Swiss-Prot record:
Signal peptide: none
GO biological process, one term: translation
Domain of life of the source: Bacteria
Keyword terms: Ribonucleoprotein, Ribosomal protein, RNA-binding, rRNA-binding
Subunit annotation: Part of the 30S ribosomal subunit. Interacts with proteins S7 and S18. Binds to IF-3.
Record's protein name: Small ribosomal subunit protein uS11
Keyword GTP-binding among record annotations: no
Family: Belongs to the universal ribosomal protein uS11 family.
Key word RNA-binding present: yes
Record's function text: Located on the platform of the 30S subunit, it bridges several disparate RNA helices of the 16S rRNA. Forms part of the Shine-Dalgarno cleft in the 70S ribosome.
Single GO term (MF): rRNA binding
HAMAP family the UniProt entry points to: Ribosomal_uS11
Length: 129
């Protein structure tokens, strides 16, 4: 017997006024997740999901496009104010932050939460170009 096709259920609109934007910018990609105060994800996007492939994902423009996309998704849930947590060494940090501010959010605080090892794991070998 064939299984019944599952219905695609649209997530219900939450009415959340403020949240936290987690901007994770690595050397290869930039991901932006907007959560509520408890840490439940409301909207997310990345340079890869916006159609950028390969080395184009790590550009500031790709991070800006991803930030504009996630801002539009979060504003559908009624979000107006954001705290921004920026992590990682990538080039998309500042452009993602500027795009979030330009899309109409009131940014209350900006924190750098990049993890710094206290001489933990051995780093990978140096690149010779």
């Amino acid at each position: 017997m064939a299984k019944e096709a599952g219905r695609i259920r649209r997530r219900e609109r939450k009415n959340i006024a403020s949240g936290i934007a987690h901007v994770n910018s690595s050397f290869n990609n930039t991901t932006i997740t907007i959560t509520d105060a408890q840490g439940n994800a409301i909207a997310w996007s990345s340079a890869g999901t916006m159609g950028f492939k390969g080395s184009r994902k790590s550009t500031p423009y790709a991070a800006q496009v991803a930030a504009e996309d996630v801002a539009k998704k979060a504003q559908e849930h009624g979000m107006r104010t954001l705290e921004v947590e920026v992590a990682g060494p990538g080039s998309g940090r500042e452009s993602a932050l500027r795009a979030l501010q330009a899309s109409g959010f009131t940014v209350t605080s900006i924190r750098d939460v990049t993890t710094i090892p206290h001489n933990g794991c051995r780093p990978r070998k140096r690149r010779r170009v």
